[in-house]
Amino acid sequence: MRTNFSFDSAGLTIAGHLSTPEDAATGRRPAIVVGHPASGVKEQAAGLYAQRLAGHGFIALAFDAAYQGESEGTPRGLEDPAHRVEDIKGAVSFLSTLDDVDPDRIGALGICASGGYVVPATATDHRIKAVVTVSAADIGRQFRQGADDAQDPSIIQGMLDAAAAARTAEARGEGVGEFAIFPETEEQARSLGQHGFEGWEYYCTDRARHPRSAKSFTWNSIDRIVAFDAFRFIDLIAPRPLLMIVGTEAVTRHMTTEAIANAQQPKELYWIDRASHVDLYDKDEYVTPAVDKMVEFFRAVS
């Protein structure tokens, strides 16, 4: 069962979908906060995982990031890593108030960029007892260096120039402006390589297109993103357990392997054979083993 809920995150109202089990079991249940990828909304990958987790007996909350989807915040389309981390903590606070949630058994799941946001959230919020990432991405690193670490350094310098100009425009009472996240055509998307194309295919075709999913970010997102280091304090998660799930064909897989190498025990790296980064958003042959693994993981610690 899925119900609409809202909660506070640093003064903004965040829109969420709470997925609950259909069975009639009584007593307090473990709960999972589920964060969506950058540009995503709760109706896409995060909602899918939340519903699947509910099918295994967990209460799961998928929500729209501040400034995006149905959540509050202006300018629309702002991607603010610090606030994204705060959103996760706000979701934990909300779950802690529910009568059917055991506040001592709350975990977090982050997909793509949220895989990079749940790490600092968990590192600094001891209410989160276990954390899982799927296709984790450090959004700051990705903007600085590209998904494959091969980006021309001049690209981010140019974007930072635009971000600086946007802040000046904002101070003058003008609009901050925005930049497109995805190309307009399939041909343009294919020219970006595997990672660029599969992101376009997921967000911009009937595969998973959603009217509230962001197709652009504000220019004043850039300097916030570039200053963010998702895995800098991953060692602080211990002694709480960490599971990182990634596809063997994901262009971003090096971010997961490097991050978990710097984490302390207990930790586990779990590979999904033949899966790409975005395959793990919605393709059942890859999502099912990922869900089965995280259910086993969360049950062991809840």
Protein language model annotation of sequence segments:
Residues 38-51, 65:
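The serine-hydrolase catalytic nucleophile loop
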Residues 244-246:
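Short beta-strand/loop motif that positions the catalytic acidic residue
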Residues 119-200:
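Alpha/beta-hydrolase-fold enzymes
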